[in-house]
Amino acid sequence: MRTIPLLPCASIDEIAEFADHLGFRVTYRQVRPNPYIALNRDGLELHYFGIPGFLPEDSYGSCVVITDDIEALFDAFAAGLRAAYGKLPVSGFPRITRPRRRKDNDNRTGFSLVDPSGNWIRVTAERSPVESPSDAPVSRLRAAVDNAVVIADSHGDAAQAAKILAGALARDITGRPEERWEAEEYLAELRERLAD
């Protein structure tokens, strides 16, 4: 059994060009009676259907991609996006988030790719048979980072996530250095998103 997501877009040609940067190839293209395109990258299939006048801001399109090598897939996507746009796009359409542990996904690592039509392609790590969510207590700063990741990377609210992290960093004067570094790095990324 398998499933292939069908995602809305304004232009199948725009999606084909974008997908080419990510290493996808077009396996099917139809203009009439309805615009439709099928893409494949190493067995990962995404299909798009065109809707004239479709706006990325109005998209509720989303799908989940589960992979056993999240870092390799992120690195390949990031390299293609940097080559196409001169930098890693972290705001607007398209954009990508960096891989992070996600408390809303059983603490598995994941990232989100938002295509030019506003569809969220949520990439998550495959869970190993022995892996389970951690029930270990976390520091207040670690909890703030986890919450900020959900708010910014899953819900798209970078401004609220930045407020959470800035407040947590201001209150945390005794935290572990690696947690402070991670929080400061993520806050800088959020501020970059907001500045774009």
Question: Where are the model-predicted features located?
Answer:
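Intrinsically disordered, low-complexity boundary segments flanking structured domains
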Residues: P33-Y36, I51, G80-P89
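Conserved short beta-strand elements that form part of the metal-binding/catalytic scaffold
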Residues: T27-S62, T67, W120-A125, E192-L194
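Core segments of cupin and vicinal oxygen chelate
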Residues: L7-L46, A159-G175
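Phosphate-binding glycine-rich loops and adjacent basic patches that engage nucleotide phosphates
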Residues: M1, R29-R41, F74, A78, ...
